[in-house]
């Protein structure tokens, strides 16, 4: 079952120190700054309505600074009142382990000083932090308040409040370890044993953990302004596992890419003089997030307008003006707004529209084409008659239709009707015609849909059929002159004209191609048939009449230019490994995109397509990653015994030493997509490497981006050859890299990769452990039960069914080979997964349990195919890391702490 637990950095365990700890580490290295003068508020001696004067405790607990995302370092200045700067100084403790906070500078005003240290842990550890001082202080660890001491002892003054741990002032419970007494007290002698103490129980994963202590000294206090801190731990750990230091350099952790402001998209204005950038920010500790869009000028990056806190959506540029339109919603009804950014004028175009589902401007800005969704019937019936496989999905009975708003007059016109949804593709450059499609199920021929493409003259309402009864769908956009359509679809979209595979093979229609379709005579030119990369998106630019293709090129995602006159492709240097999205100015040779290098977080760029020069537009991550170090990422390919070249790459730890031996994680998907060079992937390879693992990522045959023949190997394979390629690749990688420990190799994958993980463990004992997320154990049950099982199988298992292909549905299903598994396997799945139902993991778990094989199953409550809820993703991530540590590092403590075996018998 899913374990409801937040980020397990800090746990409030009510355990006396003497029961858990055998050893301790003194925090001996500190950064300090101060003293900083503060003031009591006016009338602080006057009792409030509860009869209490303003106390030193209240002054201490007032947040003078925002310490979120603040990382002290020696020589860096802390900015105080009136812009005064105070440098952080490196300090060491005296022989008794005490550090001086600061030399007090005033006897008539209260003062604060700040101490900071970075606790480096080389593995997950459990222990207890103890802090001692004669003065008042508060402590934060990784940005969370962990304790407050509001007493003064000895010559410092009289006690005025109780000490406590945690955030009790905010209603959170914590263990009251303020007056810890243990067997060590007899030995404390020299450690000023009369000082009050604050303790807090810790659980720290591998990495750096920032401890900041704010100390307050009231006027005329006389005791030494000093602090003693130590971390106690039990015999499972060693002193080398816990090292306080003042260097903020660290490795990537899960919060680096879960938290902070992240840029999600950037869109240039029509003339390229402005750009709209969209952001997303998580709001921990909740599962909520906020999104917003800002408009900037290109020339000086000045903010033109911010829509933060405006609750808008669907923001788009008008085609020919520095103006945007967007929608707001109230009580289920939508209002469409327009905002002229040159004049500042705002106006409402349509108001209180029911069931609004989208909009698009005509290029001449005369019309707004919008979509209304009509709700289907019968979804709340207790006895529901299913009208085909798609009817299991909640939205299948809904229908969407097209409407037109005449912007000048405000007159609205309905454009389409019927029993099939009409999906808008594009509007012609002159604003007169639009292209739309309809789709309907056809269960007698794969891929079980038929598609029609239409063109409508919006002045006469005359509608012509461009394509009828097409088995494979296409997406289309008009050429700049309106004479052609740029179509994207699979190799079989227009028959065999787009296929480039040997005789006898079946094309992989997830390998998207680009075509030029003539509206005058219906002829089709397959422009990418000899182009190995797969098409992610395509744009026929009116500014230069060239086609720009964002393409999956092996494990990269790159930008290519197709010269429509010379009919050739050029690679454009974007400076990135993986572009997540790109948008183009409609009237200028300017584009803007978001992407990343393999070892650098995403940033937003602009590129001038005339000379292919680029500039950074938005960088929200560099400061957050300023102290994060990464290891090397290197390419590594091998020639399989089949003669195919199998591509791959591997990630090394930041402190890599070729003379050492490292555990290895092999990550594979094995399906139709390569594992791209993304940075914040759900399976973050550079984070795994930062935890002391070598991560080998390979791209077996069947992946797109390597040419159609390579991708077609996915069809009717289901691991027949791919499993051997992965095993062979692992063996050859280990042989070629002496620093990779062959006895400590794990394998992981998700979805199809989860299926491959299970299948691999039925074929070999090469791996020490495996992790399968949302994997398929029984191809037949996935085919019949998953929402898209049968339709995905239309490509992956073309013309093969459970009744005619035992060699796939039985022989390649891990469930039927479960008795061959000897390797510990972790099965993870969302308990609400509609793509690969959780039963796929449950079946394999049941089989392995009954066989007495080592297996664990975690169901993540309320999650679908991907784990996206903030706090659940953190716990899911920790489960993965704890499993790796247990089986590849012989460090079971983290896993056992998270998932103790209560039913061991």
Where are these regions (language model features)?
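Accessory carbohydrate-binding/adhesion or oligomerization-edge regions at the termini
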Residues: 18, 22-98, 118, 210, ...
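A flexible loop/linker signature enriched in serine peptidases of the S9 family
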Residues: 259-261, 279-294, 307-312, 327-337, ...
